[in-house]
From Swiss-Prot:
Role played: Component of the high-affinity branched-chain amino acid transport system.
Residues annotated as binding ATP: 38-45
Species annotation: Salmonella typhimurium (strain LT2 / SGSC1412 / ATCC 700720)
GO cellular component, one term: plasma membrane
Signal peptide: none
PROSITE patterns: ABC_TRANSPORTER_1 (PS00211), ABC_TRANSPORTER_2 (PS50893)
The name this protein goes by in its record: High-affinity branched-chain amino acid transport ATP-binding protein LivG
One example GO MF annotation: ATP hydrolysis activity
């Protein structure tokens, strides 16, 4: 079996006397879709925050292709190809739709301040490529005709898709989605399912997903990890998780 793209071993996160994440381990292999599920307050988003540099873990290791990530700033982790969305949509609401995608690519532009000031050929080429990527992703998510519309004026489902596109224009290896189906209607959830599958199948993106929509999770995941009160409870295929009595008691039985 190939080495994992991302390996998390014995992850711990303590806030004062509260142990929010307790000995969580998981692996992501290239082009997998893996879900992290559990009841509200189980520590799922805290795990995401540790993996993406928002929190410095209290203990454990996080490695991307065997390079340690724990303690690195979030911007550096993003430049290494690990990006995320949030439970609550975080867009530059006063910017246009396409400006959101251009700003997202700023850290990836391989031109310096001097080149930018002089508008060198290399800078203009990088800007043109960024614009092309933005337009390509807006067309893919059906928002190209809204490119110059203010992001805050989009419908909620469109804002969700724009947030995913904002991640994808940076050409990540790993995309972490925190409750992407929250607030979506059934039609929008089906479109999200199709989009996630396309990201893996056609863009070679590895995906880690937090989600409460069990139909979506069971239908799209290769493997599932379950946490409860910050502690690992189970992991396995969707079928194994669906039939695990501990999981049924702790989480699925609540639905």
């Amino acid at each position: 079996m190939s080495q994992p793209l991302l390996a998390v071993n014995g992850l711990m996160m303590r806030f004062g006397g509260l142990l929010a994440v307790n000995n969580v381990s998981l692996e992501l292999r290239e082009r997998e879709i893996v879900s992290l599920i559990g009841p509200n307050g189980a520590g799922k988003t805290t795990v995401f925050n540790c993996l993406t540099g928002f929190y410095k873990p209290t203990g454990g290791t996080i490695t991307l292709r065997e390079r340690h990530l724990e303690g690195l700033p979030g911007q550096q982790i993003a430049r290494m190809g690990v990006v995320r969305t949030f439970q609550h949509v975080r867009l530059f609401r006063e910017m246009t739709v396409i400006e959101n995608l251009l700003v997202a690519q700023h850290q990836q532009l391989k031109t310096g301040l001097f080149s930018g000031l002089l508008k060198t050929p290399a800078f203009r080429r990088a800007q043109s490529e960024a614009l092309d990527r933005a337009a390509t992703w807006l067309e893919r998510i059906g928002l190209l005709e809204h490119a110059n519309r203010q992001a805050s004026n989009l419908a909620y489902g469109d804002q969700r898709r724009l947030e995913i596109a904002r991640c994808m224009v940076t050409q990540p290896e790993i995309l972490m989605l925190d409750e992407p189906a929250a607030g979506l209607n059934p039609k929008e959830t089906k479109e999200l399912d199709e989009l996630i599958a396309e990201l893996r199948n056609h863009h070679n993106t590895t995906i880690l997903l937090i989600e409460h929509d069990m139909k979506l999770v069971m239908g799209i995941s290769d493997r599932i990890y379950v946490v409860n009160q910050g502690t690992p409870l189970a992991n396995g295929t969707p079928e194994e998780i669906r039939n695990n009595p501990d999981v049924i008691r702790a989480y699925l039985g609540e639905a």
